[in-house]
């Protein structure tokens, strides 16, 4: 299995932008658009499984625009080229896009959505092109509803031929066309999953019976991996594999490149499973439709899947896997806790090393934002059951910290100097996924920096302390983390928390904590894992973010109402002492931090002491002294 895991560790190595100029690619795309009488062409970020993180071959939006953020959608007309992205990426987009591109602020009140902009800027009966594999049924329906006002038609790519792929093919002599990965798939043992795949399938089939469904189509990659207790490495940082699954009452069909499955993995598959070629899922659904079978498809799935099924045979409904996966069982919860303990050991060793290198040896050493990432990864690799990072490490000094999802480049990243340093990182372990952010200061912080950090910390602590009814969803409590920033007119342009998978995707739904309307709003429930990550970003100066992973858990209250829940912090890394203004904290906030430091002392300090690294031991002891 180690050979498989090493493939997950490796990052995408193909330069998706290549040698061909962006303007030349856009020009070629417009030629193809004219051939098909298209007035606009939409290039989403997602792949055929609506994944946030995708393999190199599916990075079509980055290929045609040069924007490398994980979220965003491009619209190209015959005269305009626009990128919609959210507040995490506005500064990054300004840096990466050429000057003739327009950045549109996604999910901001008062700013036009893609469909609103198309309605205002296209003429009646114009045609908009998109690949039906890359747009979800839910989003397609909402777009179609808006555009029908002008009878604007959404036209799907002819014969499934994506126009960006055609552009790539046109320049194949000038730059390499990436291939889909063929990495091996492996079985994840019961000691990590806590539930066998056959048990999960039994529960799914019971739900299918309730809905009178003959088939259920599963297209989300993390849901497939969870359901079958399999993991892969087709997408960097995400232990998933390109596939579809169709669940029936007597069998399961896994649509996948069979070469990825060795004999041992095949022998570990659940009973009654058949293997079919990856792309044959569409024909399989068409044949099932002809037989009059009731087919359950999740509205988050692609239009291409829906187009295989007649309306009379369709059941359009969120599948039960989404929620089942989000609510961790006892084995997964313990695994997440164990993974975070080992991850804390790695991060604390790194932070102690940084303090020594940047502060104590500042005249002797020189480190960049990129080079220190490699040092941090090295500490994580030493931990038991480490598989890979869970996303590209965000390592940013001073002004770069204001770029919320800043990614340091090997050749252009800044030298680490004294000032505000933000590091957002995480790892994949066989027993859990981690995501943690700490903001440090190497030097003497200003009073303004201390004030801003303390306000972010108070929001972070306030959310950690919150007790609330189990009928509450994440949107209801998002403001708790913002209140101390709002009181002085400050805010941050991202959600406060996202779900985290168990050795799966670092971003997991449906749970989340955000002021925005959540696509699949669901009440927070015991067993869910979420991040708590308020921040503040001052363009040109610094960025602050503090992030822990928390598990939703039952809590006791004064009146012992068993229907209340709260959060259990499982990230165990100290905050930055020199950035905390004690006079701004309440007694409850100080008590929380001191209790947190006591827990770190009990669970992490003994493990740091076992490393025999006196610098790390001294650093941690100093950091967790009571406030």
Curated annotation (Swiss-Prot):
It is found in: Cytoplasm, Cytosol. Binds 2 manganese ions per subunit. A peptide binds at residues 88, 405, 498, 507, 533. InterPro entries: Creatin/AminoP/Spt16_N, Creatinase/aminopeptidase-like, Creatinase_N, Pept_M24, Pept_M24B, Peptidase_M24_C, Peptidase_M24B_aminopep-P_CS, X-Pro_aminopeptidase_P. It holds the Pfam family Peptidase_M24. Mn(2+) 2 binds at residues 435, 498, 533, 547. The keyword Phosphoprotein does not apply. GO terms for molecular function: manganese ion binding; metalloaminopeptidase activity. Mn(2+) 1 binds at residues 424, 435, 547. GO terms for cellular component: cytosol. Its main location: cytoplasm. Keywords: Aminopeptidase, Cytoplasm, Hydrolase, Manganese, Metal-binding, Metalloprotease, Protease. Its EC number is 3.4.11.9. The keyword Protease applies. PROSITE patterns: PROLINE_PEPTIDASE (PS00491). It catalyses: Release of any N-terminal amino acid, including proline, that is linked to proline, even from a dipeptide or tripeptide. Its cofactor is Mn(2+). Belongs to the peptidase M24B family. Homodimer. This is Xaa-Pro aminopeptidase 1. It comes from Dictyostelium discoideum.
């Amino acid at each position: 299995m180690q050979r498989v895991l090493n493939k997950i560790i490796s990052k995408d190595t193909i330069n998706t932008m290549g040698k061909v100029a962006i303007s030349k690619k856009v020009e070629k795309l417009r030629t193809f658009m004219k051939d098909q009488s298209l007035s606009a062409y939409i290039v989403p970020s997602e792949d055929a499984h609506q994944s946030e993180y995708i393999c190199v071959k599916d990075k079509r939006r980055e290929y045609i625009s040069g924007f490398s953020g994980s979220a965003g959608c491009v619209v190209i007309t015959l005269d305009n080229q626009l990128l919609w992205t959210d507040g995490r990426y506005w500064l990054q987009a300004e840096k990466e896009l050429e000057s003739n591109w327009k950045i549109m602020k996604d999910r901001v009140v008062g700013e036009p959505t893609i469909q609103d902009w198309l309605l205002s800027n296209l003429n009646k009966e114009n045609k908009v092109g998109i690949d039906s594999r890359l747009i979800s049924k839910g989003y397609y329906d909402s777009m179609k509803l808006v555009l029908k006002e002008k009878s604007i038609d959404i036209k799907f790519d002819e014969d499934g031929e994506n126009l960006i792929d055609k552009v790539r093919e046109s320049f194949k002599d000038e730059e390499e066309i990436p291939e889909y990965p063929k990495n091996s798939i492996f079985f994840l043992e019961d000691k990590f999953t806590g539930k066998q795949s056959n048990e999960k399938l039994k529960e799914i089939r019971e739900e299918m019976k309730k809905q009178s469904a003959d088939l259920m189509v599963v297209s989300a990659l993390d849901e497939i991996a969870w359901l079958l207790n399999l993991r892969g490495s087709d997408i960097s940082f995400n232990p998933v594999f390109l596939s579809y699954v169709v669940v029936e009452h007597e069998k399961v069909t896994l649509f996948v490149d069979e070469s990825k499955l060795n004999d041992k993995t095949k022998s570990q598959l659940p009973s009654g499973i058949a293997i079919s070629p990856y792309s044959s899922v569409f024909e399989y659904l068409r044949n099932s439709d002809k037989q009059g079978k009731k087919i359950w498809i999740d509205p988050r799935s692609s239009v291409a899947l829906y187009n295989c099924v007649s309306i009379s045979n369709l059941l359009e409904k969120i599948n039960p896997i989404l929620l089942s996966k989000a609510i961790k069982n006892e084995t997964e919860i313990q695994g997440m806790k164990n993974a975070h303990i080992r991850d804390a050991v790695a991060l604390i060793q790194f932070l102690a090393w940084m303090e020594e290198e940047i502060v104590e040896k500042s005249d002797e050493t020189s480190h960049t934002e990129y080079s220190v990432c490699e040092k941090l990864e090295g500490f994580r690799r030493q931990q038991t059951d480490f598989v890979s990072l869970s996303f590209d490490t965000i390592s940013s000094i001073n002004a770069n910290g204001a770029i919320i999802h800043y990614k340091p480049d090997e050749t252009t990243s800044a030298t680490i100097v004294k000032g505000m340093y933000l590091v957002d990182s995480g790892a994949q372990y066989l027993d859990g996924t981690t995501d943690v952010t700490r903001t440090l200061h190497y030097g003497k912080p200003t009073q303004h920096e201390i004030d801003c950090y303390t306000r972010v910390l108070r929001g972070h602590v306030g959310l950690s302390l919150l007790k609330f009814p189990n009928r509450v969803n994440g949107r209801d409590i998002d403001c708790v983390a913002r209140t101390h920033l709002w009181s002085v007119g400050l805010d941050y342009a991202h959600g406060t928390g996202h779900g985290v998978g168990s050795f799966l995707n670092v971003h997991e739904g449906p749970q989340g904590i955000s002021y925005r309307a959540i696509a699949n709003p669901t009440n927070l429930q015991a067993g869910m894992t979420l991040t708590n990550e308020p921040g503040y970003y001052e363009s040109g100066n610094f960025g602050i973010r503090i992030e822990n992973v928390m598990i939703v858990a039952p809590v006791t209250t004064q009146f012992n109402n068993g229907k209340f829940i709260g959060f259990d912090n499982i990230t165990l890394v100290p905050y930055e002492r020199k950035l905390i203004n004690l006079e701004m904290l309440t007694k409850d906030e100080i008590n929380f931090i001191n209790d947190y430091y006591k827990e770190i002392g009990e669970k992490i300090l003994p493990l740091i002491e076992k490393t025999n690294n006196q610098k790390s031991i001294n650093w941690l002891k100093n950091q967790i002294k009571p406030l």
